[in-house]
């Protein structure tokens, strides 16, 4: 390995370990709490599911990175297809569960008098379940694309050098275009959640100012915490999606590809750390664990 690959390896392994520790921590804490209380809140259920799928996403990204750094000349069709399917599934559920968490915060925290908003708020659990199940259509579409890519790769193995180059280029472009189109929907939903939360917060602050009350009330703090979680998800997800698209266009450019994979890996690792810090229960357990480790 050259110097760049060594640097990328160190950063990638740091993100991988950090992300796995954070997501395993979330899963274990919420599981223990569920066993003790014999119930689990909707928010904890969503966050736990996110953590589990992010562990899978991190492993899929690590495998992809490993194949380009250590075995770039190995052309194993089965491994490519398996890696593509694993990444597609974990990426899909990570993305949509993050979007559903944004919607959950919006409906639980925002205060609007709109009749449709109030109706959806009353049926929130059912609404989120329908969205989660409905999003599976996007997953089926993407897995269909992976299958088409498999057929293309089989043709590549049987074709000449020119055919190989053209088919690689076509499948890469098609894959990235489909990825972009599919991810517009959850990104748009999350963006709307951010804007509506900001509008709800500004309306609340105006009411507080009108009645001569301070701005540091409970509702304001809850709005701010929710915005921190949702905005961080949106920004990290946008960065991650951009890295996936750029890396898909730069498969032949190893430095660019490795850089994009490294930057993109911060999304499933970094946002989970933000979730821990923004959740009172997880934060308390984490701080308690740190104090015990220092003793």
Swiss-Prot record:
The keyword Transmembrane helix applies. GO terms for molecular function: bitter taste receptor activity; G protein-coupled receptor activity. Keywords: G-protein coupled receptor, Glycoprotein, Membrane, Receptor, Sensory transduction, Taste, Transducer, Transmembrane, Transmembrane helix. The keyword Transmembrane helix applies. Glycans are attached at residue 160. GO terms for cellular component: membrane. Residues 1-5, 67-80, 149-177, 250-255 are extracellular. Its main location: membrane. It is a multi-pass membrane protein. Residues 27-45, 102-127, 199-228, 277-295 are cytoplasmic. It is found in: Membrane. Belongs to the G-protein coupled receptor T2R family. Putative taste receptor which may play a role in the perception of bitterness. Several bitter taste receptors are expressed in a single taste receptor cell. This is Taste receptor type 2 member 120. It comes from Mus musculus.
């Amino acid at each position: 390995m050259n110097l760049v690959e060594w640097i990328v390896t160190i950063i990638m392994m740091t993100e991988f370990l950090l992300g796995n520790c954070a997501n395993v921590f979330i899963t274990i804490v919420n599981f223990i709490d569920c066993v003790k209380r014999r119930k689990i809140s909707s928010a904890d259920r969503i966050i736990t599911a996110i953590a589990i799928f992010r562990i899978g996403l991190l492993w899929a990204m690590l495998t992809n990175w490993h194949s380009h750094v250590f075995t770039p000349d190995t052309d194993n069709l089965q491994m490519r297809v398996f890696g593509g399917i694993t990444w597609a599934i974990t990426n899909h559920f990570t993305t949509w569960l993050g979007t559903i968490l944004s919607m959950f915060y919006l409906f639980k925290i925002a205060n609007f008098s709109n009749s449709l908003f109030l109706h959806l708020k009353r049926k929130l659990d059912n609404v989120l379940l329908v969205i989660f199940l409905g999003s599976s259509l996007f997953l089926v579409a993407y897995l269909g694309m992976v299958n088409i890519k498999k057929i293309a790769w089989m043709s590549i193995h049987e074709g000449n050098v020119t055919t190989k180059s053209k088919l690689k280029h076509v499948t890469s472009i098609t894959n990235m275009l489909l990825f972009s189109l599919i991810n517009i929907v959850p990104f748009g939903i999350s963006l709307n959640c951010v804007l509506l939360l900001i509008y709800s917060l500004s309306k609340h602050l105006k009411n507080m100012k009108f009645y001569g009350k301070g701005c540091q009330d409970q509702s304001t703090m809850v709005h701010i915490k929710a915005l921190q979680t949702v905005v961080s998800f949106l920004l990290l997800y946008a960065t991650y999606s951009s890295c996936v698209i750029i890396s898909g266009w730069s498969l032949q450019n190893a430095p660019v590809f490795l850089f994009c994979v490294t930057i993109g890996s911060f999304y499933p690792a970094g946002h989970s750390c933000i979730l821990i810090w923004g959740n009172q229960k997880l934060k308390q357990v984490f701080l308690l664990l740190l104090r015990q480790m220092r003793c």
